[in-house]
From Swiss-Prot:
Protein name: Chymotrypsin BI
GO cellular component: extracellular region
Main localization category: secreted
Record-stated family: Belongs to the peptidase S1 family.
Subcellular localization, as worded in the UniProt entry: Secreted, Extracellular space
EC main group: hydrolase
Propeptide residues, chain positions: 16-45
EC number per UniProt: 3.4.21.1
Species per Swiss-Prot/TrEMBL record: Penaeus vannamei
Cysteine pairings via disulfide bonds: 71-87, 196-209, 219-245
């Protein structure tokens, strides 16, 4: 049986000045958190990673949803952004910021675009967290440059044990009061779905998990962002443990390879 699911909404007060907002933001992370069924021993430490080199992940999008929620996303064409269904479920509008590194600054590289044209997967299940995938259509194609680029979809699946790199502006530690100013990244290995399912009990074929041993993982605010490898996005940040981001539990991502047909049907984008 699955563990009890709790939805953590972390409210973060943020200074104004970002081109996506003309007023102070109160950002919340809608990342679903699942109670693990087993205990993992881990020494709590910073949730991983380092500040990314500015604009080294030029497909990374920052999503400001309904003036309330913050998520990440991936630019997969000049018109389409890939993100998580739990980010867009019930949303009215989204402000997509591309070309950003420090989301609390007015960087010359940033482009802000508002969209009301988006949809979640038809079979998205917010209780079981299945089909946690969504697409945002930009009202007009964005101009690509060295700071704003598209990311490729994978033509093959990612193997267990492969080191992958999730990126995002999520909380850098469980004790952090808010999300990160700057884009961060962490290198982590892919684990088996069987081992991940033994922890959460809701891990199906459409999910890929990373091993959070040592406290390296995604956290609140990273939702919808990419799982990167060799210029491709293999996953969409989906859910983690309600015990905390630093505790050594796996983090789960929507497996992009599993949804290639769905993405192509909706957008025409192929690997």
């Amino acid at each position: 049986m699955i563990g009890k699911l709790s939805l953590l909404l972390v409210c973060v007060a943020v200074a104004s000045g970002n081109p996506a907002a003309g007023k102070p933001w109160h950002w919340k992370s809608p990342k679903p958190l699942v109670d693990p069924r087993i205990h993992v021993n881990a020494t709590p430490r910073i949730v991983g990673g380092v500040e990314a080199t500015p604009h080294s992940w030029p497909h990374q999008a920052a999503l400001f949803i309904d003036d309330m929620y913050f998520c990440g996303g991936s630019l997969i064409s000049s018109e389409w952004v890939l993100t998580a269904a739990h980010c867009m479920d019930g949303a009215g509008f989204v402000e997509v910021v591309l070309g950003a590194h420090n989301i609390r600054q007015n960087e010359a590289s940033q482009v802000s675009i508002t969209s009301t044209d988006f949809f979640t997967h038809e079979n998205w299940n917010s209780w079981l967290l299945t089909n946690d995938i969504a697409l945002i259509r930009l009202p007009s194609p964005v101009s690509l440059n060295s700071n704003i680029k598209t990311v490729k979809l994978p033509s093959s699946d990612v193997s267990v044990g492969t080191t992958v790199t999730p990126t995002g502006w999520g909380r850098p530690s469980d004790s952090a009061s808010g999300i990160s100013d700057v884009l961060r990244q962490v290198n982590v290995p892919v684990m088996t779905n069987a081992d991940c399912d033994s922890v959460y009990g809701i891990v199906g074929d459409g999910v890929v998990c990373i091993d959070g041993t040592g406290g390296k993982s995604t956290c609140n605010g990273d939702s919808g962002g990419p799982l990167n490898l060799n210029g491709m996005t293999y996953g969409i940040t989906s859910f983690g443990s309600s015990a905390g981001c630093e505790k050594g539990y796996p983090a789960a991502f929507t497996r992009v390879y599993y949804y290639l047909d769905w993405i192509q049907q909706k957008t025409g984008v192929t690997p």
